[in-house]
Curated annotation (Swiss-Prot):
Tissue specificity statement from the Swiss-Prot or TrEMBL entry: Expressed by the venom gland.
Signal peptide, first to last residue: 1-29
Name under which the protein is recorded: Venom protein 27.7
Superkingdom per UniProt: Eukaryota
Length: 59
């Protein structure tokens, strides 16, 4: 049982690292798919909060 939880934790950690190192469009698509269930106002808030982080490398 502990081995199964250990492998699940490792796979989740690798998936998290993969999502960190993915290009910004994939991350934006993932955030929009997560916030699509909520209202449009919260989606706009998420985009306003996330977009400056993707603009900073271009400076």
């Amino acid at each position: 049982m502990t081995f199964i939880t250990l492998t699940i934790g490792l796979s989740l950690r690798t998936i998290f690292l993969i999502f960190i190192f993915l290009p910004p469009p994939h991350l934006l698509a993932r955030t929009t798919s997560l916030t699509r269930r909520q209202t449009r106002k919260t989606t706009i808030k998420v985009f306003v909060f996330i977009l400056p982080f993707y603009q900073t490398p271009n400076w």
